[in-house]
Amino acid sequence: MKALLLMSGGLDSSSAAYYYTRRGLDFDCLFINYGQRSARMQLRSSKIICEKLNKKLLVADIRKIRELFISDIWLKPHEPITHRNLVIIPIAIAFAKEKGYEEIIIASVKEDCEYEQNRIEIIKELKNLGEILKVKVSTPFAGMPKSFLLKLGVSAGLDPSLTYSCLLGHKYHCGQCSQCLKRKEAFKSANIQDPTKYLNLS
């Protein structure tokens, strides 16, 4: 059964990619450009990670859809796009079904559940959608802290300096958005040196 790992180039999905490669899982990766500001840098990191792991990276470019569900995101650059998973996960499920994948893996961690689109009830309904289309939707790390998944990735060979987390999409991480703050905390909690270059925006 071949799986499809949703890839963003961040700590979580990159750690998952290394973890599953080490375990010998047969999987490809899917990057979805849904109009996020950081798409270019995310895709860059995703390509690097997949090249190092010799994994196929599929890219779905649906950036035009952002106009349908994003209103003032450009006025709130430090905030993640609300409800994005309600859009991209069903697309990933349909994509997997069409391409013959029987499972999609989402590397969401415990901290992600504070966002509305990652609430347990919503994820459960998305899994039900997958069942209808006979595509298993797996969230194996949902109960784990980000720092634990980072440890798994690094122990499997991940160089975290190759990953990208910032919401702004600059060459260097801003260090202030919610994703940068969670990135910093993950390294601190995991007792792993943070190799990230952060901008000084103060």
UniProtKB/Swiss-Prot annotation:
Domain of life: Archaea
Cofactor: Zn(2+)
Molecular function, one GO term: ATP binding
Positions bound to ATP: M7, S8, G9, G10, L11, D12, S13, S14, S15, A16, A17
Main enzyme class: ligase
EC numbers on record: 6.3.4.20
Assigned keywords, A-Z: ATP-binding, Ligase, Metal-binding, Nucleotide-binding, Zinc
Family the UniProt entry places it in: Belongs to the QueC family.
Protein name (Swiss-Prot/TrEMBL): 7-cyano-7-deazaguanine synthase 1
Species, as recorded: Sulfurisphaera tokodaii (strain DSM 16993 / JCM 10545 / NBRC 100140 / 7) (Sulfolobus tokodaii)
Gene designation: queC1
